[in-house]
């Protein structure tokens, strides 16, 4: 971030400022400015996800029972059918029965959401969560 930083002021009601300061401490930020910068970036990412013209990224985290009949094959088939969107995946053995997989996906928001629902809805998937992101050049 080699851009010039510009200082400006913000007026807030006292209760809202207390909430802000509480979050700065809770999340370990070094200053209010750091928290506000992250909140603005989050807003930009949300807006990109609301647009169908932007390429965005997502990380799908799933936990599943690898003993579930045909589940692994179905997940691999889905990923291979969408190889243009799937950047990579990481597989971790949690215990004898359960695996955790993260799948990094790129594409239009609707493509990523559809793919996440398709994988997350398979029988044997115990947990599925899509974390939304995008390139933020700020």
From Swiss-Prot:
Top-rank taxon, per record: Bacteria
SUPFAM superfamilies membership: ACT-like, Ribbon-helix-helix
Keywords carried by this UniProt record: DNA-binding, Metal-binding, Nickel, Transcription, Transcription regulation
Annotated GO biological process: response to nickel cation
Keyword Transcription regulation in record: yes
Cofactor(s) this protein cannot do without: Ni(2+)
Cofactor annotation comment: Binds 1 nickel ion per subunit.
Cysteines paired by S-S bonds: none
Listed transmembrane segments: none
Residues the entry annotates as binding Ni(2+): 80, 91, 93, 99
One GO molecular-function entry: DNA binding
One Pfam family this sequence matches: NikR_C
Name of the featured protein: Putative nickel-responsive regulator
Organism field: Persephonella marina (strain DSM 14350 / EX-H1)
High-level lineage: Bacteria, Pseudomonadati, Aquificota, Aquificia, Aquificales
